[in-house]
């Protein structure tokens, strides 16, 4: 591992009734597997249907995401297997599961007895494989399986020799086609997991001393807190799939893989703190 971390903080505005405090943190980490145990070329940390793997291999970054994708020729045209009628495939290293870039921004604004705290959290540079979306596509539950439902599906490209190729899948055979489409090419269910989130917002009010004394207390605060309030940015592909970029379901080594985990929740609460 080789990286850098930067942390900055300051108070841009400090007036008698208004203050603005800010904190920023940035880190970047690069990893590279230098050696594995004798006799081991690839260490598989996790896997899914159709062969997607989270691996460690010498010369590659930690938690590399490897998966089959639809094969294309140098012109970008899909290559088909004439014997099966399906798209040909090839194994590819798509990205890493651990985000190399982490950033956080904290702002606290105070005006009189009120304060507002906003925490922005972001991660960049990683990818994640969604087993959930792969299953849903196999069973015809995603928009990827809409083409051909009314009049059949025509696929075209080149065969493995480079000759033009066309095949028509009748409506009655589409379940077979999409079952293969969803299982044989898991690379299409690997998403960029970049995000910027409003992680936390707190509105706090410091109760006046005159009111606190009525209950014989020293101080009191009332706070409205929200967690995971909004995704301010995520990649278009993962947004259209309706997925949260933080789709990891494990704290283990297989970062970059998600099964059928429960979605992230938004939490809103009120806290009253009284000091006697």
Residue ranges and their predicted role:
Residues 1, 44-66, 73-75, 151, ...:
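C-terminal beta-signal and terminal closure region of outer-membrane beta-barrel proteins
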Residues 11-97, 137, 144-146, 154-162, ...:
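Conserved small-residue
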Residues 123-221, 225-227:
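Extracytoplasmic gating/loop element in the C-terminal half of outer-membrane beta-barrel translocons
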Residues 4, 16, 113-118, 210-211:
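Repeated loop/turn-to-beta-strand initiation elements of outer-membrane beta-barrel proteins
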Residues 3, 78-89, 171-187, 246-253:
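Flexible, solvent-exposed coil segments and beta strand-coil junctions
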Residues 20-22, 105, 111, 116-118, ...:
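Transmembrane beta-strands of outer-membrane beta-barrel proteins
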Residues 2-8, 101-107, 114, 198-203, ...:
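Hydrophobic, lipid-facing positions within transmembrane beta-strands of outer-membrane proteins
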Residues 10-12, 26-32, 111-113, 122-126, ...:
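Transmembrane beta-strands of outer-membrane beta-barrel pores
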């Amino acid at each position: 591992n080789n990286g850098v971390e930067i942390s900055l903080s300051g108070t841009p505005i400090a007036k008698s009734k208004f203050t603005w405090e800010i904190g920023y943190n940035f880190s970047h980490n690069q990893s590279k597997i230098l050696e594995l145990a004798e006799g081991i070329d690839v260490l598989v940390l996790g896997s899914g249907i159709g062969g997607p793997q989270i691996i460690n291999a010498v010369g590659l970054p930690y938690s590399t995401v490897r998966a089959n994708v639809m094969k294309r020729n140098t012109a970008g045209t899909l290559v088909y297997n004439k014997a099966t009628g399906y798209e040909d495939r090839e194994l590819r290293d798509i990205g890493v599961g651990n985000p190399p870039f982490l950033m956080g921004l904290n702002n606290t604004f105070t005006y009189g007895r009120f304060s507002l705290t906003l925490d922005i959290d972001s991660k960049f540079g990683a990818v994640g494989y969604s087993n959930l979306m792969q299953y849903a596509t196999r069973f015809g539950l995603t928009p990827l399986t809409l083409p051909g439902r009314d009049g059949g599906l025509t696929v075209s490209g080149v065969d493995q020799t480079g000759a033009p190729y066309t095949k028509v899948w009748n409506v009655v055979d589409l379940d077979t086609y999409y079952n293969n489409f969803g299982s044989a090419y898991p690379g299409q269910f690997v998403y960029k997991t970049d995000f910027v989130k409003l992680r936390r917002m707190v509105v706090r009010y410091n109760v006046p001393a005159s009111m606190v004394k009525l209950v014989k207390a020293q101080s009191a605060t009332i706070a409205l807190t929200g967690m995971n309030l909004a995704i301010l940015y995520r990649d278009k592909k993962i947004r259209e799939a309706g997925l949260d970029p933080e789709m990891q379901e494990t704290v283990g080594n297989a970062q970059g893989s998600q099964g059928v985990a429960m979605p992230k929740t938004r939490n809103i609460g009120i806290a009253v703190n009284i000091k006697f």
